[in-house]
Amino acid sequence: PKFLQALVASAFAYAVMTFLMTATPISMHLMEKISLSKTGFVIQLHIAAMFLPSLVTGNLIKRFGHSKIMYMGVLLFLVTIITSLFEQNFINYMIALIFLGLGWNFLFISGTSLLVLCYREEEKFRAQGYNDLIVYSIQAAASLSAGVFLSLTSWKTMNLICLIFLIIIALSTIRADLKKNPSN
């Protein structure tokens, strides 16, 4: 259960983040007519939110545990989705993309750091290989499909689609936690 929890958190966090981030410039600039400089600024803030928390995420995982940081990542992603359901303007895109970056950081780092605790020494190359193949294949599919989904649906619908992946992440984490503590 822990290996699956780590894999699901990492893969779907990357998929959700890539799916929405890739569609953002198209939605902001081409569809909503927000300036290219503001669109670029939102992406810059998003990237900062993806990586700056890494300075403390490891310590948060040590203090609170992998699962709690994963739940926090899901909640941060939920803020992204909720914000995206309101008016599509510069401020809402900015808030949504900052929380998208923060959620990705918590989920991806907690997932990848949990992964190394889920296998024996002789399994490490195979386990890491499977993980990377699945994570980056799903991420590539999300990137390639973002423009298609945006053209066929809407920014709001794309965000709602991401709820499915958040539910899967939460359920895999709950399952792993219950297996760890069967008395719950």
Give short role names for the model-derived ranges:
Residues 2-17, 98:
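Pair of pore-lining "gating" transmembrane helices in MFS-fold secondary transporters
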Residues 22-42:
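Short amphipathic helix-loop junctions that connect adjacent transmembrane helices
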Residues 52-66, 150:
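Helix-to-loop junctions at the C-terminal end of transmembrane segments
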Residues 106-119:
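Intracellular juxtamembrane helix-capping segments at the cytosolic ends
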Residues 123-152:
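A late C-terminal transmembrane helix in Major Facilitator Superfamily
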Residues 80, 91-99:
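Paired small-residue
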Residues 68-82, 163:
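Structural signature of the two symmetry-related core transmembrane helices
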Residues 148-166:
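A membrane-interface helix-boundary motif in multi-pass transporters
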